[in-house]
Amino acid sequence: MNSGKFRADGPNDAYVSLLNPDGSVHTPKWIGATRDGLELNDPLGSAISGGKLYTVDIDYLRIFDLSSGKPLSSIKVDGATGMNGIGISSDGTVYASNTRNPEVVFKINPDGSSAVFSDHESLSLPNGVAIDNDGNIVVVNMGDNKVITFDQNGNIKKTEYAAESGGDGIVIMEDGTKYVTSVRHGSVSKFSNDGDVSVIARGIPNAASMCYDSIQNQLVIPMNSNYAMGFIQL
């Protein structure tokens, strides 16, 4: 996801790049080379589900066809001011964090309706969102080091703590292991199933949202300040 110019200077100029597994650029503007039917301003978190690419764009959820990049739909989320992280449940429900003013998590249903999923006081600059293997919604705080697991009704099931604060991205593996980036400390915390939490990587400038490449068995981490991507073999 590339935001392009600031919205005030050049709205609707964001684009999506396609990368090879080694980090080389396959297509600089896979989405965004043309603007035919495209509206994309400042996209942040993204996720793939059901042959579709989802991204949050300020107060909209944008959905694209994964094979062609064609825009499919844009859903306005009332009350959103800057959505950031995104997770998609097995039934197509989208959960998206709104990091500031307000600090909440939104729920966007498959029919396009939306509502606040949680505004719990434990949310402190909520950022990364993922769905665990039991269908729970896991949210990473950037304002502290909390990693909060909610059930589907919005109740807190448990709170874990990353090794360092400033959480951003989260990946949950099939075996339940979690990886969380710290955008403030440039590190990755590993949450083992035995309760151990440890830093497995450091020195990643502005380690932001991330994804897991299951073919190469690696974490892929945007380094915002470097306009680059980092790769960590697991």
Describe the function of each predicted region.
Residues 19-24, 65-70, 108-113, 150-155, ...:
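Short loop/turn segments that connect beta-strands within beta-propeller blades
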Residues 12-17, 60-62, 104-107, 146-148, ...:
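A short loop-to-beta-strand structural motif that recurs across blades of beta-propeller domains
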Residues 1-27:
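Beta-propeller domains
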Residues 1-4, 57, 98, 141, ...:
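Recurrent small/Gly-Pro-centered beta-turn motifs in extracellular repeat architectures
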Residues 34-52, 78-96, 100-102, 120-136, ...:
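Beta-rich, blade/repeat-based domains predominating
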Residues 25-37, 70-76, 113-120, 155-161, ...:
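A short beta-strand motif characteristic of beta-propeller blades
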Residues 223-226, 231-234:
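Flexible, glycine-rich linker and terminal segments associated
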Residues 41-64, 68, 72:
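Acidic/His-rich segments in extracytoplasmic proteins that coordinate ligands and/or metal ions
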